[in-house]
């Protein structure tokens, strides 16, 4: 039996404020297998980002456990790559110096780390941009830099929290196709949060739908569309059927 990269077992999480108690997640269980691309959708406040924060060790669940590669680590920090919604590029550092941060944290010599990073620039469409600064980059290019920095952490599993949410439609479609090519080439495991149901279907092997707060698993749907994916699939009947089914689960009339 294949060991999951990530396994959530009966996860519950509640936040306590001065005047309110906010239940974020309730009894959430699912697995992500090696090489899978899993997208997560749900209404705002359904606990999607909380799930990622728990997975990377920024928060701890009130109930349940999270396994990484079949183990129960005491500390989950650094075991998976995590890219939050904002790119968090440091404006005073060049593109190359921004993506070298994971190597600096690990104490890897700069000459070695520069070589490893530069070898990946062409795969991420960043060749000839290594000496530019974030202020000179488009939104799509900034996301490529942020994703390369996450990639260079060297983890087999990546958590991407709405990485394309702030981009225009054309740039978003371009980066969807680019991400799929990189994912397939390097055989990573990806969990991807999005509010865009079409994007969720287009990218995924499997879509997980979270209910409104507190977030529970409302539906898991396998996406049996052929790979490699192409944008023309969006107009095909089976794609539309999958999108309408997910929108119905989210309570959206179509």
Segments from the language model and where they lie:
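Conserved beta-strand-loop-alpha-helix hinge in the C-terminal portion
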Residues: 212-245
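Active-site/binding-pocket entry motifs
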Residues: 14, 226-229, 252
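Short hydrophobic beta-strand elements within the C-terminal catalytic ATPase subdomain
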Residues: 68, 209-210
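Extended, non-globular alpha-helical segments
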Residues: 166-169, 243-254
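Conserved catalytic segment of ABC-fold P-loop ATPases
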Residues: 203-209
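ABC family nucleotide-binding domain
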Residues: 3-198, 203
């Amino acid at each position: 039996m294949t060991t999951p990269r990530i396994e959530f077992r009966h996860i519950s999480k509640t936040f306590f404020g001065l005047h309110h108690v906010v239940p974020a997640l309730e009894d959430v269980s699912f697995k992500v297998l090696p090489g899978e691309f899993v997208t997560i959708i749900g209404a705002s406040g359904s606990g999607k980002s909380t799930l990622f924060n728990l997975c990377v060790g920024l928060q701890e669940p009130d109930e349940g456990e999270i396994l990484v590669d079949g183990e129960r680590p005491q500390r989950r920090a650094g075991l998976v790559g995590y890219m939050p919604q904002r790119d968090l590029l440091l404006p005073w550092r060049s593109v190359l110096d921004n993506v070298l941060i994971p190597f600096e944290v690990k104490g890897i010599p700069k000459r070695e780390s520069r070589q490893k990073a530069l070898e990946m620039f062409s795969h991420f469409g960043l060749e000839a941009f290594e000496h530019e600064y974030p202020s000179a980059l488009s939104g799509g290019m900034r996301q490529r830099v942020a994703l390369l920095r996450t990639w260079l952490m060297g983890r087999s599993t990546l958590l991407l929290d709405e990485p394309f949410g702030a981009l225009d439609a054309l740039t978003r479609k371009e980066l969807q196709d680019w991400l799929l090519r990189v994912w397939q080439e390097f055989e990573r495991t990806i969990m991807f949060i999005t509010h865009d149901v079409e994007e969720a279907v287009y990218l995924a092997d499997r879509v997980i739908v979270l209910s409104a707060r507190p977030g529970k698993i409302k539906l898991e749907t396998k996406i049996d569309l052929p790979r490699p994916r192409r944008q023309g699939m969006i107009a095909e009947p089976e794609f539309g059927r999958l999108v309408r089914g997910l929108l119905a689960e989210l309570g959206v009339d179509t």
